[in-house]
Amino acid sequence: DRHVTVIIDVSFSDDVKIIKDFVLNEQCPFIQSKEEEGLIKFEWFIDEETKTGTLIEVFKDPISWEKLADKVIGTPVNIKFNSLFIIEKMTVLGELTDNLEEKLQAAGPMVKNYVGGIN
């Protein structure tokens, strides 16, 4: 299976309304506007009490992830994401391209390669 699932666990200190507004009215529309066909899912889950969240991204393959990352990294929306959230943990289920591995090195992602399963 060539799918790549990216799980980003974050924490935040801003009011939950600010976070939800960013996710729903800025980040999601921005990601959707990039029209990356290989993006299968881009979903947020938030625990308001602990001010933590999880972003799950699923891609058709590693190249699709790299294409979207190239369109997003360094943009104002990406910079705002980095100012609103602290990335506590990034887990990549599947392969990384060499280019993405280099770009994400600072985030210290935990990478787990696919072994098998039922799809």
Predicted features along the sequence, with ranges:
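Short S/T/G/P-rich N-terminal loop/turn motif that feeds into the first structured element of a domain
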Residues: 1-53, 60-71, 83-119
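A short, acidic, amphipathic alpha-helical segment used as a generic capping/interface helix at domain edges
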Residues: 73-80
